[in-house]
Amino acid sequence: MARIENVTAELLHDESLVNVVVRVRDSDGLEGVGEAWWGILDPERRSRTASPIIAVINDMLGPRIRGREADAIERLWFEMWDWGYRYADQGIFLMGLSGVDLALWDLKGKHLGTSVMALLGGPVSDGIPGYASLPPLREPDRLIAETARAMEAGFAAVKLHEIDPELTAVLRDEFGDAVEIMVDVNGHFDPLQAIAVGRRLSELGVIWFEEPVRPMRDHAAIARVGASIECDLAAGENEYVLEDFDRLLATGALAYLQPEITKIGGLTAARRVSTLAELYNVALCPHNFRLGPSLYASVHWAFTSPASRWIEVPWMPDGEAFSFPAALPPMRNGQVLPLEGPGLGCG
């Protein structure tokens, strides 16, 4: 069996985000490529906030698994988790572990000449609806233009990151029912504000209202909002461990669960989270806002769960480009199609 020779993390920049790319090289000369969470969105601080995550990978996890059999993913995951639990069971440590785990799955698929999806049991469907996840645009004209571009690219749904519900109204007036709309406010409101906004979004017929309150992990507040509005709620990108997902789902407030694969421990942990979504009969919609290994891993994961309903596909405004050299996942008639690999299939 090939053994792990090197584990490294590096930072890539694009116009609005960064990617923390993780590479695991083995004794046969093959390289698996993964991705960790990258810190915060603030352009002035995003590189600095990614630095601790990179340090976890380069200084802690990499040395820990160097020399080990590369295909023993489950064993390596639990050993890293058990060792790192004494450091922190969430946050920065788990973000780093996620990136290493994705790289190991990519490496295993490349060794076997097959896709990660096949390693996980194969797809349960021929396609999953994809939506274009737009960045915050704030201006009606830009919002209309980017939605039109996304529709021309084959998307039948878009997600807005706009806190003003009247911007959603502008889009509905422009396109009518020709496009499905989701709205993510990234925990901008207190519960009373969220209820007022949620009622307006309900009138506009949105698919879901995402992360309505701050703190984003205030499960009681999420449940309060959900009980007071008609449109469905989505949340989960800021949960980390299985117990927290269980507590969130137990509120009964969610219609859509949105785990972030680069925060929860990678694909190894993701499989357990999707089982939980199935048990609670809640739709699985993996969160993602980067083009690269994390998006591809989310697609592989989504296709192996019968709970999957939507795939989030990041969308860059006209004239901007992602830093990672990968194409968007294949689509047809608004549906994301299964990926072929080998490995994750993106590099």
Predicted region positions:
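Catalytic core of soluble alpha/beta enzymes
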Residues: 160, 165-293
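Active-site mouth loops of central-metabolism enzymes
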Residues: 127-142, 184-191, 234
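Flexible C-terminal active-site loop/helix
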Residues: 2, 12-14, 27, 100, ...
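Conserved, mostly hydrophobic/aromatic
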Residues: 29, 61, 100, 113, ...
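Structured beta-strand/loop patches that form or line metal/cofactor-binding pockets in enzymes
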Residues: 1-33, 37-44, 320-324
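Metal- or metallocofactor-binding catalytic centers and their adjacent structured scaffolds
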Residues: 25-111
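Catalytic domains of carbohydrate-active enzymes, especially glycoside hydrolases
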Residues: 149-158
